[in-house]
Amino acid sequence: MAETLITKPPLSLSFTSLSSMLPSLSLSTANRHLSVTDTIPLPNSNSNATPPLRIAIIGFGNYGQFLAETLISQGHILFAHSRSDHSSAARRLGVSYFTDLHDLCERHPDVVLLCTSILSIENILKTLPFQRLRRNTLFVDVLSVKEFAKTLLLQYLPEDFDILCTHPMFGPQSVSSNHGWRGLRFVYDKVRIGEERLRVSRCESFLEIFVREGCEMVEMSVTDHDKFAAESQFITHTLGRLLGMLKLISTPINTKGYEALLDLAENICGDSFDLYYGLFVYNNNSLEVLERIDLAFEALRKELFSRLHGVVRKQSFEGEAKKVHVFPNCGENDASLDMMRSEDVVVKYEYNSQVSGSVNDGSRLKIGIVGFGNFGQFLGKTMVKQGHTVLAYSRSDYTDEAAKLGVSYFSDLDDLFEEHPEVIILCTSILSTEKVLESLPFQRLKRSTLFVDVLSVKEFPRNLFLQTLPQDFDILCTHPMFGPESGKNGWNNLAFVFDKVRIGMDDRRKSRCNSFLDIFAREGCRMVEMSCAEHDWHAAGSQFITHTVGRLLEKLSLESTPIDTKGYETLLKLVENTAGDSFDLYYGLFLYNPNAMEQLERFHVAFESLKTQLFGRLHSQHSHELAKSSSPKTTKLLTS
């Protein structure tokens, strides 16, 4: 394989040394313990007497307008100001727009809502004409980092102003897919609220806005928020940006896990890099999390490469180099970097029988399953339900499991093969398939028996079958793109990929192959006919990347937090699904898919590039701050 050039960041910066460059955000006030509030009761029908709030939004970009739409719908009075001209959007929403901050502040809003970016908030606070506002005005921020915001607000606001630090854990994109704010988390910390009834009531009235929309209200200290957010939010954004850099696109054989990653990449890439950089710089915990991701990915690569090294050494010493299966390098074409879809290879499988009906006598098959573990039992259950006769064999004893499913179990392969099954399904692992195939007593079977595999890689079993099976045996390579977990509620609309590698020309053999495929069509599977090479091309992008991300996250030992975002919940679900698979499966996807190595290296290069972006910008910012704080003489030296 051609050597891949990996560009390292041109900075001599370690994670440890970088920590000294991040802001030190020591807090002068004690942090509250984490507490998740009960839902605040919705106001009763007589609560309309409560006057609406006069809310000024500073920063009327996408997010400010997003919040304004709901605030207006609830009857509150809104003013807005932004550096850019958003007067047209304000008029459309029914918001009074001001180009001059002094004019806005002289309207004496009850609440000032800061909807600025993380990077610009300090400059905004420095320019606000606080003297134009009423004393004790409530200031609210909605930043994704909270210790930083709290520290700035305490530093710049007059002492008689109230402070409420909040983080709506959602935005326009997540609300659109969720159809509203219901069930989405709203995190807040009452940093400084005066004891007078009016000020307490005003704060509660503001929080009530989000309660009315069905948000899950979570009260916690800003310190706890940032600790949890470094995992849930920063990891989600890091993985989303990595996937976006890989330029993955939908394929004809998407799994549910891969579709979730595509959605994540689409959502995250809609955010600016400034937001991601702000999460990195202004959350004290993010640098440690980035280092953990780095170490986890290196550990995963080392685990794969060390196993590969061991296999090659073993084969070399035993003089069995013939067992190393070399495939054409499909990665030479530059188009592979964009995972271009070849839709012309996808053939729609036509099936006209009634879904899930039992088969007639003429279509009933006698099927032998070799390898009766979880996946073999999973398939056998449906085949028996449809009226097929199922026989099974495995190295381990599954007699009891077979009896429960109505499957005839054999402890001797010769005995099973002498029953002359029409179809043999190999449900073995990728790594054991060759050894199992070489041990089969083919002479006990009828000539022209149909052999089927269900492996997650396809060129490898295709070549193995053609090399090992007698020439008068039929070959059908398949990949059910689901398993016991993803298919536990039925197979409807789940992809079943197949390639009729070698099917005899007579009607009986064609009919037998179609009867086998009908098993999956009857259950509502999306039948996709494509070549083994095309399958492996797409699977390297979809399946291997999905398993790589799942394995990477598993090494981070992620846990649910009180402030999980929808994106983070997607990652947790992915870990749950992939962690149930053995490492042998993942290693098999890597070893026997000729495109997997290229994808692993692309992931590595993308991660290095992302770190370069972060550290390069951090280094530039640090140099700029040094230049600003230097004497004129030093500044001249730095800039010359």
Swiss-Prot record:
Major localisation: plastid
Intracellular or extracellular location(s): Plastid, Chloroplast
Domain Prephenate/arogenate dehydrogenase: 53-334, 365-640
Annotated keywords: Amino-acid biosynthesis, Aromatic amino acid biosynthesis, Chloroplast, NADP, Oxidoreductase, Plastid, Repeat, Transit peptide, Tyrosine biosynthesis
Entry GO CC: chloroplast
Pfam families (UniProt xref): F420_oxidored, PDH_N
Recorded superkingdom: Eukaryota
GO molecular-function terms, A-Z: arogenate dehydrogenase (NADP+) activity; NAD+ binding; prephenate dehydrogenase (NAD+) activity; prephenate dehydrogenase (NADP+) activity
InterPro entries: 6-PGluconate_DH-like_C_sf, NAD(P)-bd_dom_sf, P5C_Rdtase_cat_N, PDH_N, Prephen_DH, TYRAAT1/2
Transit peptide boundaries: 1-18
Tissue: Expressed in roots, stems, leaves, flowers, siliques and seeds. More abundant in seeds.
GO BP annotations listed: tyrosine biosynthetic process
Catalytic activity: L-arogenate + NADP(+) = L-tyrosine + CO2 + NADPH
EC number(s) on file: 1.3.1.78
Top EC class for this record: oxidoreductase
Family affiliation: Belongs to the prephenate/arogenate dehydrogenase family.
Note: Unlike TYRAAT2, TYRAAT1 is composed of two highly similar and catalytically active peptide domains. No proteolytic cleavage between the two domains.
Protein name as it appears in the record: Arogenate dehydrogenase 1, chloroplastic
Species whose genome carries this gene: Arabidopsis thaliana (Mouse-ear cress)
Gene designation: TYRAAT1
